[in-house]
Amino acid sequence: MKVTRILWLPLSFLNFIERRYDTMTTQKQSALQTIEEKKSLIAGIADKVWEFAELSLQEFKSAETYCEALEKEGFDVERGTCNIETAFAASYGHGRPYIGILAEYDALSGLSQEGGLIERKEKKAGGNGHGCGHNLLGAGAFAAALGIKAYLEQNDVSGTVILYGCPGEEGGAAKAFMARDGLWKKLDAALTWHPEDVNEVATGSSNSCIQTQYKFTGIASHAAGAPERGRSALDAVELMNIGVQFLREHMSDKARIHYAITDAGGCSPNVVQPRASVLYMVRSNHVAEAVELQKRVDKIAEGAALMTETTYEKKFIDGLADTVSNFALERVLYRNFEELGVPEYTEEENAYADALAETYDSSGVPGVAAENDENAKEQVEKMQKEYGHAMNGFLTPLYQKDAFKAGSTDVGDVSWLTPTAQIHVAAWPNGCPGHSWQNVSCDRTEIGHKAAVHAGKVIAATAIDLIEDTSLLDEARAEFEKRTKDGFVCPIPADAVPVIPD
């Protein structure tokens, strides 16, 4: 696999030069060469998981594929971590520092798609697909673990790498349940990545998120002949929704409440509906606020039941925290990303990505730096123009100020318990819509494979730096302690278990 080293200068266009390891230690070079030698294994696992396309908390084949591969590679593997069936933890090494690498492997419903095409074509009618690239995410984390293991194996140093298999990121929030159980506290640092349309070190906060299902039960009756005997569960759902609409005036600007009626009772209007359900999602950029807002939504559900003389059952689905940035770790990731450059694409790969980008609006300037800084935006625009293809074949500037994304991820829960940082590696052309068939198609190409392998190298190189120079971990820990001084408010009840909504 070829990569291009990119030097970013504030007042210049891209400069493409040959990749050099001049400043890399021989030990680090050797570890990264292990990843290069095993790229067929890494790509093969990515493709297997892509084929399985298992939904959240149902990733049995995907998880076992990783467990078997990790055992063959000499890791100690624990299945069913934190009593989550499709979770695992694979470790190698001894002593501190403990470096955690986070893997995901769940797919999305309704996104079945043939790989490598530039047109919509379902692989299986109504089937699932990896619209968020988690087949690549897990494979890249696996690659990183292989590289770190090689380093620990070849050098007489203290250190332990733990690859965590984290199911249900799209629904189930396994990392959040693991956080509730204290799993992440033992780590000195956690590193991960996500496929994107850009090469960058990710930063900034995200929304916390709590999902709860409310199931109302009433009494059926003839809506015309004996309406007084009926108690409408559907009325309760509607009154709950009205109550929440009035709550919106009394929450912060960044808070959000979404809902979906998952059961309207039936399709006969002349029946007083005896059952109805609604699924609520409460978001805020601070997990403590989300927890308090959720309590108010619970009271509205109780009030709706009282008004309609129905009963209700509350079913906790999942909850996750906002993300805590760690600039110290992000700087180490960026130094290694700069040194390793970004994946290089063939003419055929660029032609495919260019054609795929014609199927959606591919305009826009990518990356967190461009979103938050006008000077950075100008630089990235120049980089795009210089590169001249839909793939963003360059590394965007490091951004070290506050930033915010409205979405949610259970990586946030990890970041509240240990210093955490992540990168994005381009696996799709610019502006590729999230959770789309285009993503699924690109995930099953060499472009996707290159992203996974390269992410593994950047993460492994960073972990090696942390092991070799623990003062970097001290700096990251000091920043972490400052940012989390108010303490972690866990959104997961003590008795909750990961579930799939009805």
Language-model segment annotations:
Residues T26, G44-K48, E119-G127, F216-A224, ...:
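A short small-residue
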Residues I6-T23:
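Short, Lys/Arg-enriched N-terminal segments with co-localized hydrophobic residues
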Residues T26-H130, N135, A139-A143, G147-G159:
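Acidic/His- and Gly-rich active-site-bordering loop/insert found
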Residues T86, L108-G110, I118-G129, N135-L136, ...:
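Histidine/acidic-residue-rich, glycine-tolerant segments that coordinate divalent metal ions
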Residues E238-D502:
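Metal-dependent amide/peptide-bond hydrolase catalytic core
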Residues V49, I101, H134, L163, ...:
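Divalent metal-coordination and catalytic microenvironments
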Residues Q27, K38-I45, Q58-A69, P97, ...:
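General structural feature for long, well-ordered alpha-helical segments within catalytic domains
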